């Protein structure tokens, strides 16, 4: 049987099962309320297991612990006048024992017709089976929601991997690993928030639709505001609005929210992604690197219980101080055959990028060429956490220039497992310098660089009130979760990743 024929047969089987279950649902409707909403749960599965699973049967029976649990029925064993069912809730699983003598003949007859996937409620007393499993001996059992579509079998293979992303609801039902990933994601985000609040930062919300896209070099999504008859752009970064708040006197601010970039999709990129950006007055990029280390270590502890984690079979040490290299130092560290003279020769660097199959930057000055070469020959080798520092000014239009190294900025990017995780810098707070850099970006855009920034006159106006010395940083939440949950693809850590239409 071909794959197409097999898929057709499976579809026919599923349609038949769904038709039968709709008939069951109709029978339930005829008896009364098909979707009751008056059940009150008293306990979750895992806390019950944690508190009582180790107890001896006699001791548990003596306590007479009454519970009301509910969840999706994942297993069912009918044995004449009694049956076992396993219910799954958000915390875990617990077994129920349903006997005709305890729940009544009519209810038991109904229960035997129920299907895997039904949402079931059970009231009763805890006891231990002969095999020692903690179980609820049901005195009452009810269906709360009828399953129509049969549960999928265990996901495996490429086709099913796509199904996991498209039907995350089914994936979460069937995969404990997926549920654990997204529970960890929530804990990671909460820990980031806790660290920021503990450091005296104020959480704020800034616009998601911008009249001028800014704060990063990227292609925006464009929409139209009908009432104002004007284009708007889904934000590519909140940076310029957050720095406006620092101008206004909110000296430590952060935002955890979505950014949108109308660019390619890959295992590392989703058009809609989550970041934290934070800004602190009277600080610099050194302080931002310290904050970044703290955030990542604290998140590792809450997600993994350790600062040493394993990613795709290889250890990552987040506990020791992160390494620091300039772009040229990193290139030479991993490519000792290159000489200082070669790396200072723009023409040679450009030819080496081409030889390696890389793409030349839109504005090929020496600094941007060195960065492009770094991306070709060193970036993927940065396994343990490494700050790459002192970026060239031509690729850092919002970063403060170095006082000691002309042409460079006080900027860093953090790389772990060969991919960027954070970007930060001492903020440029000279409005005249910022205006000139915006003009240079406009020139690049006019020359064909559609990722170059627009000129933001209102941001310049804000800076003219005086932006104090400020450090800022952005950390990609999705990539951090990938690292801490050992996920190979960004789609594994986004509940509903973007997909091509079916």
Swiss-Prot record:
Cofactor: Mg(2+)
Residues that hold Mg(2+) 2 according to the record: 420
Region annotation Disordered: where it falls in the sequence: 1-22
GO biological process: lysyl-tRNA aminoacylation
Entry EC number(s): 6.1.1.6
GO cellular component: cytosol
Cofactor binding description: Binds 3 Mg(2+) ions per subunit.
Protein name: Lysine--tRNA ligase
Taxonomic source organism: Chromobacterium violaceum (strain ATCC 12472 / DSM 30191 / JCM 1249 / CCUG 213 / NBRC 12614 / NCIMB 9131 / NCTC 9757 / MK)
């Amino acid at each position: 049987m071909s794959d197409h024929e097999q898929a057709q047969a499976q579809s026919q089987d599923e349609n038949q099962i769904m038709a039968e279950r709709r008939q069951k649902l109709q029978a339930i409707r005829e008896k009364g309320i098909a979707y009751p909403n008056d059940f009150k749960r008293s306990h979750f599965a895992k806390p019950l297991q944690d508190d009582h699973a180790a107890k001896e049967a006699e001791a548990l029976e003596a306590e007479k612990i009454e519970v009301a649990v509910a969840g999706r029925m994942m297993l069912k064993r009918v044995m004449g006048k009694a049956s076992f069912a396993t219910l799954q809730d958000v915390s875990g699983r617990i077994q129920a024992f349903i006997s005709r003598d305890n729940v009544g003949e009519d209810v038991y007859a109904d229960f035997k017709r129920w299907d895997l996937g039904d949402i079931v409620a059970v009231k009763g007393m805890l006891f231990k089976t002969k095999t020692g499993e903690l179980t609820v001996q049901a005195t009452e059992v009810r269906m709360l929601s009828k399953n129509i579509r049969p549960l999928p079998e265990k996901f495996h293979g490429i086709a099913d991997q796509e199904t996991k992303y498209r039907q995350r609801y089914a994936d979460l039902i069937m995969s404990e690993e997926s549920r654990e990933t997204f529970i960890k994601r929530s804990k990671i985000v909460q820990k980031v928030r806790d660290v920021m609040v503990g450091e005296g930062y104020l959480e704020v919300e800034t616009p998601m639709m911008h009249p001028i896209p800014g704060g990063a070099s990227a292609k925006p999504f464009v929409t139209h505001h009908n009432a104002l008859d004007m284009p708007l752009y889904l934000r590519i970064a909140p940076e310029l609005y957050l720095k406006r708040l620092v101008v206004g006197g909110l000296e430590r601010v952060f935002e955890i929210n979505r950014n949108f970039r109308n660019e390619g999709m890959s295992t590392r990129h989703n058009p809609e992604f989550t970041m934290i950006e934070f800004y602190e007055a009277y600080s610099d990029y050194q302080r931002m690197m310290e904050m970044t280390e703290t955030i990542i270590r604290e998140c590792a502890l809450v997600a993994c219980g350790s600062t040493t984690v394993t990613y795709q079979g290889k250890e990552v040490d987040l506990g020791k101080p992160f390494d620091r290299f300039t772009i040229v130092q990193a290139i030479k560290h991993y490519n000792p055959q290159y000489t200082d003279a070669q790396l200072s020769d723009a023409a040679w660097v450009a030819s080496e990028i081409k030889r390696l199959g890389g793409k030349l930057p839109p504005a090929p000055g020496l600094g941007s060429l060195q960065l492009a070469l770094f991306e070709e020959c060193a970036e993927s080798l940065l396994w343990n956490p490494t700050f790459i520092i002192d970026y060239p000014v031509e690729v850092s239009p919002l970063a403060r220039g170095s006082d000691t190294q002309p042409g460079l900025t006080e900027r860093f990017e953090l790389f772990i497992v060969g991919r960027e995780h954070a970007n930060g810098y001492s903020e440029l707070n000279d409005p005249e310098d910022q205006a000139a850099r915006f003009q240079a970006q406009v020139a690049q855009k006019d020359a064909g660089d559609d990722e170059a920034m627009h000129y933001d006159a209102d941001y310049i106006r804000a800076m003219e009130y005086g932006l104090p010395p400020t450090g800022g940083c952005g950390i990609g939440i999705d990539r951090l979760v990938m690292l801490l949950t050992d996920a190979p693809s960004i789609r594994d850590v986004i509940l509903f990743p973007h997909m091509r239409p079916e």
